[in-house]
Amino acid sequence: MRGAFLATAAAIAGTAMADIAHMRRHGHDSFHQRRAVEQPAPEADATCGCTTEVVTSWGPPTLIPIATSSPSSTVTSEVVTTLHSTSYSTVTLVVTPSGASPNRESAPATPAVTLPTPGVTSFSTTGTYTIPATTLTVTHSTTVCGATTTELPSGTHTYGGVTTVVDRHTTVVCPYATVEPSGSTVTSVIRTTTYVCPSAGTYTIAPTTTYVPTSTVIVYPTPATITPGTYTQPAQTITVTRDNYIYVCPFTGQQLPTTAPVAPATTAVPATTTAVPATTTAVPATSSVAPSSSPSKPAAPSGAVSGQMGMTYSPYTNEGGCKDKASIISEVALLKSKGFTHVRVYSTDCGSLEFIGEAARTSGLRMIIGVFIKQSGVAGAQDQVTAISKWAQWDLVSLIVVGNESIQNHFCDASTLAGFIVSAKQSFKAAGYSGQVTTTEPINVWQANGDALCGAVDIIGANIHPFFNADVSAAEAGKFVAQEFKTLKGICPGKDVINLETGWPHSGEANGKAIPSREEQAIAIKAIADEVGSMSVFFSYFDDLWKQPGAFGVERYWGCIENF
């Protein structure tokens, strides 16, 4: 599907038709076909393996103060309501040395200790509530289950877990927090897992995957080490404006002097380990936990390219689920520091408008937003038009792209797409939008359907990928894309051109002179940025490991943020 040979390049006309027929259709066609009902799950990594050893000792539950129904001394405008509180229990991890067997009968009894784990309070109704202050003193270091929250839009999400970065093949042994049934409730526990990192990269160990039908705030446990010190949970007056609101009240601490080093929370391994952030409402009952990983290639040196306009961003995990809000906001914010002015999103799913929009506003980025057309055709995309019109944060939007290679993928014909673009433009205008609207297709589709499409769009949108032309090397990528610009301008006279997808893969099989590698990717991207970077959107932020391999096995490996 990637760009075509130029009609004017007579010297290579003999091979152009073969390239159009064979090379322009590849795994990119299924950019958003990631759900189980639309596409098979990503292939499992045969080199990864992991075993889990559960070594758990149950301890007393963490105590959380519960306000009584008697009037509080705090003066508020509403009556203080009794709090309905829940908490995660405190669990002490006891690791049995390798080769030894646990002897539960000989284990000494341990006195109950109250530890400063965060208080999780559920407010069933609106009102003003007071949580009294609490002070605790801890004299020994203990690994416990903390708690954190994250907001998830509707859909399938992967969150939590422990992230580790290794520089070579490494076996990592670390604790992770999870929940398991305990009678009619659930209890947080600390488990240990052994994970084999097959090569250098970043891995997420033991994340949780869940499905939420609507936008939800979940609470989930995280491993934490409580060190000796005095911890205070200050008095809090909370005004709750919606029903079933969950509030996490943390402790703040001052560490006590100590003459002995604090025991590490993980087995000594040449790796750095941190808890993965995330935020959401009551813990969904459909959650499942399995040790897994999300490897990525080591980052190449940054700062090689400048002068670029935009970057595509997809809010999906390596498994095809939706990323949490915290991850989306931090990743999008990085684009501004890399010199980008725009972020392009393809659809409205996974909180693309709300979460990416919030990140763009905070970071000072503009957005190129999209209406994605799938196999269901234009009728199935109307709800996205409605969602965008209701969102209506037009001060963030530079361009709306209706359809991404939908003609190339045979999801609709040119006349149907043109009619849908005109209809969508009317809806956006009625909602207050006065900016540009277009679609995006490879150059061969524009050449064949310009008569139908030119009148419907305000600017010509094209996906130009020099890799899929076998006679173009990485060093020639910039000149090739610039020539495609000239050809496209001749299709719709008087209208500008924007390159909405361009880049170069870093892994896969060679396509003639087009060779995928980290080095060639860096060369190609710099060449494109030098020629047409100010009117190009680079593809893509990360590798898309949830995709099928596609033509030349490159479809998953276009991540290029390290080059900027």
Curated annotation (Swiss-Prot):
Active-site positions on this chain: E405, E501
Compartments, record wording: Secreted, Cell wall
Broadest EC class assigned to this enzyme: hydrolase
Renumbered residue ranges of the record's region Disordered: 285-304
GO cellular component terms, semicolon-separated: cell surface; extracellular region; fungal-type cell wall
Keyword Translocase in record: no
GO biological process: cell wall organization; cellulose catabolic process
Pathways involved: Glycan metabolism; cellulose degradation
Keywords tagged on the record: Carbohydrate metabolism, Cell wall, Cellulose degradation, Glycoprotein, Glycosidase, Hydrolase, Polysaccharide degradation, Secreted, Signal
Molecular function GO terms recorded: glucan endo-1,3-beta-D-glucosidase activity
Catalytic reaction list: Hydrolysis of terminal, non-reducing beta-D-glucosyl residues with release of beta-D-glucose
EC number(s) per entry: 3.2.1.21
Residues listed as glycosylation sites in the UniProt record: N404
First and last residue of the signal peptide: 1-18
InterPro entries, per the entry: Beta-glucan_modifiers, Glycoside_hydrolase_SF
Stored Gene3D superfamilies: Glycosidases
Similarity field: Belongs to the glycosyl hydrolase 17 family.
Its job: Beta-glucosidases are one of a number of cellulolytic enzymes involved in the degradation of cellulosic biomass. Catalyzes the last step releasing glucose from the inhibitory cellobiose.
PANTHER family: FAMILY 17 GLUCOSIDASE SCW11-RELATED (PTHR16631:SF24), GLUCAN 1,3-BETA-GLUCOSIDASE (PTHR16631)
Name used for this protein in its record: Probable beta-glucosidase btgE
